[in-house]
Amino acid sequence: MGLIWSLATVSGQSCTCPDYEQRKSKCKHVWAVELTVTKEVDVEGNITITKTVRKTYSQDWHNYNISQQVEKEQFMKLLSGITSNIRSPAYSFGRPSAPLGDTVFSMVFKVYRTFSGRRFNTDMTAAQQHELITKRIPYNTMFDYFKKKDLTPLLVQMVTLTSLPLRTVEHDFAIDSTGFGTTNFQRWYSFKHGKEISSRRWVKAHFVTGVKSNIVTGVKITSEFDNDCPELPELVKATAENFDMAEVSADKAYLSMDNLQAIQDVGAKAFIPFKSNSQSSGNGMLWKKMYHYFMLNNEEFLQHYHKRSNIEATNHMIKSKFGDCVRSKTWTAQVNEVLCKVICHNLYCVIMEMHTLGIEAEFVS
């Protein structure tokens, strides 16, 4: 529990903290009060006291509570509306495979529930009873499909599809990457420390997200050692195919001439801060223009760049709701599991905006 100090009013300077008692000069508490409450005395002796009021933003608790209460039900219906349009591969010979749409439904819904395969069996039975799927998929079959490489492009398309209901809402975007832990470890012998060292491996996800609703509009999964900078052009281009992009914010790791050009090519303005050793010359007119804007209009630049912090909220939303690690053991299964987390997150954002903004989910069958 923190300590409480008694401060005088604006008419005098005093504080009961040990720092003020010892030095008899302004302590941090007095400075804090003066920054919040200022006193001005004019020539006639009139005193004007100005108090700084912190701006607060109200929460639409009514619609938020409603969306939370019906989230699971609407999630299942929205997901079924997407997966029911997935066609199974043509049957040729051998034992018929499980319906692909039902299998993808079970994969995404299992990640949403964060249960093990066996405990998730009850949810699949309920989904079949509500006619959201045609066949209940055994959990071992579902795990086998997580390992299929040909499902990865389909899941990426589902990420894009689930973001489309918000294409009229989002115009400013941010890009960043985040890691998801795995159960795999790597070991090596360190000659410096004279012992074997082990560390947990993780999967890196590169996101483009809208700064208003935190919807993910572009995603790419790579290994933990891949750099962030080269991934921006592809993700921005994919987002621009469905969204009217006005701004793209990113941290210094994405600073390069190629990235600035890629953002300009889609009609957006880049807000990427320059490094301390960056120079204005040598990289073309676009680089020079953005460098001078950053240096001469830094306050205005930071007002736009601050939107980048919303992608940190996106990362937190995904990890806190659907887990910050993956259960799968193989690389392909880990990639597909992370993509399922992103699909779950997008559907959650769509459900939230259905109640707060009144949008419609056009991908429902």
What annotation goes with each model-predicted range?
Residues F93-A98, F115, T125-F143:
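Short, basic interhelical loop/turn and adjoining N-cap
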Residues H29-T36, D102-R113, C340-C349:
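Short, hydrophobic/amphipathic alpha-helical patches that form generic packing surfaces
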Residues N297-S365:
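Basic, amphipathic alpha-helical segments enriched in Lys/Arg and hydrophobic/aromatic residues
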